[in-house]
């Protein structure tokens, strides 16, 4: 009898088991030798260990009171792009079993929206509005690590440094000020393994690019502020951002990201 051909799911599970073993050894010995551990993850593990993050911690730290959270939301530089981000990413997440988090440049989660039952589960590990998910505070995780290295990041299950987070996968992309290039926040999608897919990364990058372009164009006010956004990125050299009967062509840099 011929052996059953390997499936993608089998490969992912095999890699996950190898990463889990590597994580156990790293926590015990402080060294990574397994090739199954991606370099971006190994480097993040080392930073997490150097910062004294406890891999056995049960929950992230809540650092913002309700009043502080409201003030942080008002002062975050990209707040004007929130309606677009909701339309392109957060509202669809509620129907797809995912959670979307928007954080500031310090890794504090200012908005966490999406699937209601999944949000309740995420809150038990401290993935909630007002919590601090910087890499220095919470170890290897997509939003924190994306901010730490200023680059899109996908973290799968046992690649997380803290054990309590290892049932989750996530994709995060930093947000930049279009005028200065400075990091001003991060957008993250959290859920099962499907959120660490190439498609999920494309969707988050597209949303960030559209948000940055929106900031460059200036705030939208008046009746059109509630009009839904739509982003077209396929089959064209430059991505188009639609709102009602108005179409805005994204910059070449943002289109290249998509």
What are these regions (language model features)?
Residues 86-89, 96, 159-164, 225-229:
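Intrinsically disordered, low-complexity segments enriched in polar/charged residues with Gly/Pro
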Residues 115-119, 173-177, 235-241:
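Short, charged low-complexity intrinsically disordered segments located at boundaries
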Residues 204-209, 216-251, 255:
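Short boundary/linker motifs that mark transitions into or out of structured domains
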Residues 73, 192, 245:
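Conserved short-loop catalytic and cofactor-binding motifs
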Residues 96, 103-110, 115, 125-214:
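Sensory/regulatory domains in signal-transduction proteins
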């Amino acid at each position: 009898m011929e052996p059953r051909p390997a499936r993608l799911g089998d490969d992912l599970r095999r890699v996950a088991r190898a990463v889990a073993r590597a994580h156990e050894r790293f926590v015990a010995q402080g060294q990574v030798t397994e090739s199954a551990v991606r370099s971006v993850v190994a480097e993040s593990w080392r930073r997490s260990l150097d910062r004294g993050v406890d891999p056995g911690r049960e929950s992230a730290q809540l650092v913002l009171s309700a009043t502080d959270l409201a003030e942080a939301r008002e002062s975050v530089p990209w707040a004007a792009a929130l309606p677009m981000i909701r339309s392109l990413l957060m509202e669809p997440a509620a129907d797809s079993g995912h959670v979307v988090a928007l954080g500031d440049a310090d890794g504090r989660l200012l908005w966490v929206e999406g699937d209601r039952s999944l949000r309740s589960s995420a809150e038990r590990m401290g993935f909630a509005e007002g919590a601090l998910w910087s890499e220095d505070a919470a170890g290897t995780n997509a939003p924190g690590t994306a901010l730490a290295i200023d680059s899109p990041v996908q973290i799968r299950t046992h690649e997380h440094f803290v054990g309590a987070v290892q049932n989750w996968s996530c994709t995060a992309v930093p947000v930049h000020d279009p005028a200065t290039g400075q990091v001003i926040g991060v957008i993250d999608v959290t859920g099962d393994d499907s959120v660490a897919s190439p498609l999920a990364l494309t969707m988050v990058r597209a949303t960030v690019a559209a948000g940055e372009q929106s900031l460059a164009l200036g705030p939208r006010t008046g009746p059109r502020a509630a009009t839904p956004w739509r982003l077209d990125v396929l089959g064209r050299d430059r991505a188009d951002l639609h709102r009602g009967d108005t179409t805005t062509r994204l910059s070449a840099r943002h289109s290249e990201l998509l």
